[in-house]
Amino acid sequence: MKTKFDRLGTGKRSRPSPNNIDFNDQSATFKRNKKNSRQPSFKVGLSYNSLLDDCDDENETEEIFEGRGLQFFDKDDNFSITADDTQVTSKLFDHDLEQTPDEEAKKPKKVTIRKSAKKCLSTTILPDSFRGVFKFTEFNKMQSEAFPSIYESNENCIISSPTGSGKTVLFELAILRLIKETNSDTNNTKIIYIAPTKSLCYEMYKNWFPSFVNLSVGMLTSDTSFLETEKAKKCNIIITTPEKWDLLTRRWSDYSRLFELVKLVLVDEIHTIKEKRGASLEVILTRMNTMCQNIRFVALSATVPNIEDLALWLKTNNELPANILSFDESYRQVQLTKFVYGYSFNCKNDFQKDAIYNSKLIEIIEKHADNRPVLIFCPTRASTISTAKFLLNNHIFSKSKKRCNHNPSDKILNECMQQGIAFHHAGISLEDRTAVEKEFLAGSINILCSTSTLAVGVNLPAYLVIIKGTKSWNSSEIQEYSDLDVLQMIGRAGRPQFETHGCAVIMTDSKMKQTYENLIHGTDVLESSLHLNLIEHLAAETSLETVYSIETAVNWLRNTFFYVRFGKNPAAYQEVNRYVSFHSVEDSQINQFCQYLLDTLVKVKIIDISNGEYKSTAYGNAMTRHYISFESMKQFINAKKFLSLQGILNLLATSEEFSVMRVRHNEKKLFKEINLSPLLKYPFLTEKKQSQIIDRVSQKVSLLIQYELGGLEFPSYEGASKLHQTLVQDKFLVFRHCFRLLKCMVDTFIEKSDGTSLKNTLFLLRSLNGHCWENTPMVLRQLKTIGLVSVRRLIRHGITNLEEMGHLSDTQIEYYLNLKIGNGIKIKNDISLLPCLNIRTKLENCKIENEELWLTFKVEISATFKSSIWHGQHLSLDIETEKSSGELIDFRRLQVNKLQSPRGFRISAKISPKLEKIEFSIHCQEIAGLGKTIVYSTDHLASQFSAKTPNIRKDLNSLEKCLFYESSSDGEVGKTSRVSHKDGLEESLSSDDSILDYLNERKKSSKAVESAAVIHPEAHSSSHFSNGRQVRSNGNYECFHSCKDKTQCRHLCCKEGIPVKYIKEKGPSSIKPVSKPDQIRQPLLAKNINTTPHLEKRLNSKPKQWQEENTDIATVHTLPSKIYNLSQQMSSMEAGEQVLKSGPENCPEIIPIDLESSDSYSSNTAASSISDPNGDLDFLGSDIEFE
């Protein structure tokens, strides 16, 4: 796909356009006849409210200049464009550089329109099919004046308009414009709406879903399930957040078709780009603008003085800046008066400051409320309660005339509501919150104290909005509200559907008074925050192969808003200057900063350098794919190997993603009670086995996870019930992050070949999916209608896992759980939907290399299932193979719906001759407790080859057990006739196999072997023995085998030759060559044994006590922790094969699959098995869909 990267680094070049207009040219001034020449002109200034900022507009100033699209102006209108009105400076940067005409032509065009007394446009100007989108018949003043730029133009546009002016309609006009351009063919059209918060996204979804009948509307946020995500990606209008869209666009190669269909991007609250999380918004807009062709951006912003910088950043396809439409406060439907009060504090305690703010509230309410509804935003939940109590005790309002119809469960809330005062925060129950909102809407509540939960969403009739303090808890510390939060709170004052006038008051520290005055008056300069976490986004762009050198990194940055602002105000980016030379020029500073970040990524192995280019490693791909912070990823990479389950849990709990949480003071006792629970798997105890003080976020996260997985009961001490809702919300936040963190850890441990850590990570991931520890009876809670009480009843009847539950009839289930007749079948049907998993392994080949064994296993898996979806989740299987030492051999993932027929693959493993075990496991990732494990020990090699060598040392597992035979009792060489295998194959031996007799005879007598260890060529130089054979360099004679490559074949005589003593006086004609099929069936010889002395030394080592043959074939672990001996189950199978039956019901035998043998072996065990070209099961790593 052709992208705009062809134009990267060409910002100084412009394309001449005949339509470009020099705003400084007085000839560009158009004047109409004026009825009143004294009428003041207004400048379209940028003013923004985050609540209503839903619209994306594009302004075509050329049409205005040429008189097109201005049907709503007439000769009586006072309309003019002057050089002064444009407010465009003569320089793009603050450097004293002379501009060329081309550079001036690329300055953003800012339209300034004088007020018009002309009536507003009617919706009849639109086609009949479009009018149904709007619930009104006439556009307001702002919408009418923006109509030509939005509906009659296709250029990028930046719009500024005050809160309550109806900007949502402008977004809808932009959508209708696209529909018009595509002739209503929307099958191949995508529209993206991006808002900074989920609340705004949900609000827009509710508005647009019923409005656009012919367009499908979907929403993508962190709360969207997998099935909803797949459905939303197919919609015409996708409503999403910056972080979610960033996550999706990081998988550009996976969804390239989707992104090619995007034609319109609507950006709400673009001024949030100045906040730390605004870097994601800046990155995705840059990515879309550079990689998509013919895409239109319509963005809304609050009032900022440097809106032209946004226009310079969001350039059009012809490299021209975006158009600017800016409207002042006169366009607001409800006039809003704003005040900022600063207070000086002698105390440093924020709780004491909150009490001082309370004392000032009475004066403010009496001055500004006018006996109308008041909404007070408080920084904390405790502050909402204390504020409500303070106002109640001071009788700020007389008792409400209307009586409350609700009696909330919270006693304090109920007491306050009877006096017309209430509080609202996320810690109270949903029923109480709903009751408070209804009573406030009904007028029964005069004063409502709330946290920021009411800043968006429900429209409340608040005449006066008071922001009581501008600091709130964030990341375990007090921080200033974001600009978005403040603007959203102010936007709640005087809503159009309730008031004609409103008032907003900000109470803050005297030091911050000027800051908030600049914010509400639009004089706060907008800066970029991309540099604060640029390292993570550079890693993502490297993974996308957008950045592969320092030059491409700098070119990519040239397309960002950060580059525009750094050129004008480098002093605002001290983090950049910290790593660059003091007197460096602008581009050199950017170059040095990028070089430092890339070197850091190389150091921590997130990227590496290959052939002079930066390439993303497996760690970098995992970090990008799962949207992990740099600090968390570095922690995963540097983690110790072979972590236990507790170690994995601790590693997860210390991730950077949880730093936004905090341990509240009133929660410490709650978590202490949880920590002392005997059901807790890993409590935090001191050396004296007493509970530690729970004051760290990592402790809280760990306890929340264990609380859920262990099915613990909520503490019952006095006052604990008030914290139940808080615990539920914190638990939801923790679980939302856990899944992508664990999936990233899976990828990390695969790359590190750390089988133990991977196994425990997958165990924890399955437990989180099932909301229970996998090796406990709590797995039964995954079934519908099964709760803690039902689990206890089942345990009393000996039912502890899903398999045992599957054996019960519906009648038994009803009896055990005390259910009504007919309810047991529902649970039985739920169990029957669980897949039945099968796995079988067989040892195919064994050979020796460098004193180690190379084993090749054939693995066959299959599944019997009615549906590949269970409880709304697509099921997937994890197949892991690891050594008992903890080293990972192989890991694969496969969707259950891909197992319509059995699948097979081969795994090669290199193990030591000690009693090392290999563990094969298969588990369903989305269901805890559904999986099987096979443990294959080197002991089983003896039974595999017992027909050849009954007397074999089981701890050696070397060449002899595969090849040598026992001598006769009289000391003579035993017969080496054909030996039948269990699988029906025969071993063909030629006359030259007499070498085996020789070696066995030497093995009996150490002295005889030592005397014959060295054979001189002179001793048998007689042609009498050669009989046509050639003499080898070691003195032995060549054999007559017809092997193609005697250095690689299985015959010792081919590799070592035949000693003269054992050459039979037979001609070549009497020797029967070994057929090729026989060669394949023979065990492989060690490639590194090249001399007879070396071989004899190994054969004549002092024999150990021979052990009896072990009849057990494999050990199978069935969750939870049950061990079965399969020797009886597998009596009909050949030695070395294992069958795994999984699920609640018995499954039929699998028909074996014929897999072609492979003779290729790799020196890297994990690499060769994971990338096995002969396997028909692709390695998917941790390819997990985003939440």
Curated annotation (Swiss-Prot):
Renumbered ranges of motif DEIH box: 268-271
PROSITE patterns reported in the protein's UniProt record: HELICASE_ATP_BIND_1, HELICASE_CTER
Binding site for ATP: 161-168
Phenotype upon loss of function: No phenotype during vegetative growth, transition of double strand breaks to later recombination intermediates is partially blocked, crossovers are reduced and distributed randomly, with a high incidence of homolog non-disjunction at meiosis I. About 10% of wild-type level of meiotic divisions at 30 degrees Celsius, at 23 degrees Celsius delayed appearance of meiotic divisions, which eventually reaches the wild-type levels. Decreased spore viability.
Bias (Polar residues) ranges: 16-30
Keywords for the protein's UniProt record, in alphabetical order: ATP-binding, DNA-binding, Helicase, Hydrolase, Isomerase, Meiosis, Metal-binding, Nucleotide-binding, Nucleus, Sporulation, Zinc, Zinc-finger
Zinc finger (C4-type): 1039-1054
Cofactor binding summary note: Mg(2+), Mn(2+) and Ca(2+) support ATPase activity equally, Zn(2+) does not. Mg(2+) and Mn(2+) support helicase activity. Might have a zinc-finger.
Pfam family, one: DEAD
One GO cellular component, as annotated: nucleus
Compositionally biased intervals (Low complexity): 1158-1171
Gene3D superfamilies in alphabetical order: P-loop containing nucleotide triphosphate hydrolases, Sec63 N-terminal domain-like domain, Winged helix-like DNA-binding domain superfamily/Winged helix DNA-binding domain
Domain Helicase C-terminal residue range list: 360-542
Domain SEC63 stretches: 616-922
Main location (coarse class): nucleus
Location of the protein in the cell: Nucleus
Keyword DNA-binding belongs to the record: yes
Helicase ATP-binding domain: residues covered: 148-322
Residue ranges, annotated region (Disordered): 1-41, 1146-1187
EC number: 5.6.2.4
GO MF: ATP binding; ATP hydrolysis activity; DNA binding; DNA helicase activity; zinc ion binding
Family: Belongs to the helicase family. SKI2 subfamily.
Subunit note: Oligomerizes.
Its job: DNA-dependent ATPase and 3'-5' DNA helicase. Required in the control of double strand break transition and crossover during meiosis. ATPase is slightly better stimulated by single-stranded (ss) than double-stranded (ds)DNA. Unwinds Holliday junction (HJ) DNA to Y-DNA and to ssDNA. Efficient unwinding requires 6 nucleotides of 3'-ssDNA; seems to initiate unwinding from blunt ends when they open slightly. Binds HJ, dsDNA, ssDNA and 3'- and 5-overhang DNA.
Name by which UniProt lists this protein: ATP-dependent DNA helicase MER3
Organism, scientific name: Saccharomyces cerevisiae (strain ATCC 204508 / S288c) (Baker's yeast)
Gene from which the chain derives: HFM1
